[in-house]
């Protein structure tokens, strides 16, 4: 079931906060660091890869972020006044998708910039969370080619090379 490990009343509470774009403090059970508090200006609750996530602007790292709802223990507080979030660095990444990725779903931060004659589409993804951008690009596999910026191309290639090395080392 998709709600496995998810407190349904907590999920509904988070959904209501998202409708109001509330600023809340959550208690999160991190797999690496244990329980930790995070402040977030809520945006949406949405399914991705069969799991329910809370999305919003995290005030700790000043970037758009997401948390698996199953790891959120509770909402600790709701701020009456939202913090002004300034100096959020955003990344603009362009990539080309081939027709093999016809089932691709674009998120709110992605825009189609060009539809080419060879059945490819140029997409631009703008977000403050570079990890989310890279994760999305890698999910397309060989149907996707990063166009810009150069440092993202390099990081994607580095990730793919380390994945390849991991597979090759496993076969030794």
Residue spans of the language-model regions?
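Short, mixed charged/polar active-site loops
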Residues: 34-39, 62-64
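Short aromatic-glycine-enriched beta-strand elements
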Residues: 51-55
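Flexible linker/loop signature enriched in Pro/Ser/Thr and Pro/Gly
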Residues: 59-83
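Polybasic (Lys/Arg-rich)
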Residues: 87-172
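Bulky hydrophobic/aromatic content
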Residues: 1-25, 29
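Short acidic, glycine-rich loop/turn motifs
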Residues: 28-33, 58-61, 97-99
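Short beta-strand segments that buttress and anchor functional surface loops
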Residues: 26-28, 56, 125
